[in-house]
Amino acid sequence: MNNLDISFNDEVNFLKDSDKDWITWISNLLLSAKKEIHKENTQEMSINFVSSKKIHEINKKYRGKDRPTDVISFAIEDGLDEDFISAFSDDPDFVEDIGDLFLCPEVIKRHSVEYETGFNREFGYTLVHGYLHLNGYDHIEDDEAKVMFGIQGKVLREYGLPLHPDQENHGKQIH
């Protein structure tokens, strides 16, 4: 079983403002990431598309950063006992609520221009990055960053989304 149940909340009409089938695109990309990190059980999560103003407020309130950002992850497992979670993680019938992503398409678009990556690539990068955070990956320490950005890079390449040249060396983060 390799299911990923995603609830979408679109406050900025991102999903409707395009001819692209973003829901399928997002689901397939995240299923690729899920497979790469060897999650066998069903996962559920929410993806919230919000304005620059809204993500700025969230970033300030929960992260103490007074600026808009591209993605904020609220992982359910943060603070939960690791042994408790691991006892169920290999059970294919266990449905794991991994948390909520808040994405700001406006900031992602700005980053795609700034980093010259193109919107689809930048959106995919941001989406996989947030998903990995929901699954306990981090990039505070160098060894953690190497693992996280390595997975992120592999998933993006396999999905046909090119890495920024600065990321080719061990999946280094450019922003």
Curated annotation (Swiss-Prot):
Q: MF terms per GO, please?
A: metalloendopeptidase activity; RNA endonuclease activity; zinc ion binding
Sorted alphabetically, the Gene Ontology cellular component annotations on this record are:
cytoplasm
Broad class of the protein's primary localization:
cytoplasm
Co-factor binding comment: Binds 1 zinc ion.
One of the GO BP terms on file? rRNA processing
Compartments it resides in: Cytoplasm
Q: Which cofactor does it need?
A: Zn(2+)
Sorted alphabetically, the keyword list is: Cytoplasm, Endonuclease, Hydrolase, Metal-binding, Nuclease, Ribosome biogenesis, rRNA processing, Zinc
Classification via Gene3D superfamilies: Metalloproteases ('zincins'), catalytic domain
InterPro entries per UniProt: MetalPrtase_cat_dom_sf_prd, YbeY, YbeY_CS
Please tell me whether the keyword Cytoplasm is annotated for this protein.
yes
Q: Binding positions for Zn(2+)?
A: 129, 133, 139
EC number, UniProt record: 3.1.-.-
Q: Which HAMAP family match?
A: Endoribonucl_YbeY (MF_00009)
Q: Which NCBIfam families match?
A: rRNA maturation RNase YbeY
Outline what the protein does: Single strand-specific metallo-endoribonuclease involved in late-stage 70S ribosome quality control and in maturation of the 3' terminus of the 16S rRNA.
Recorded family membership = Belongs to the endoribonuclease YbeY family.
The name this protein goes by in its record:
Endoribonuclease YbeY
User: Per UniProt, what is the name of the gene that codes for the protein in this document?
Assistant: ybeY
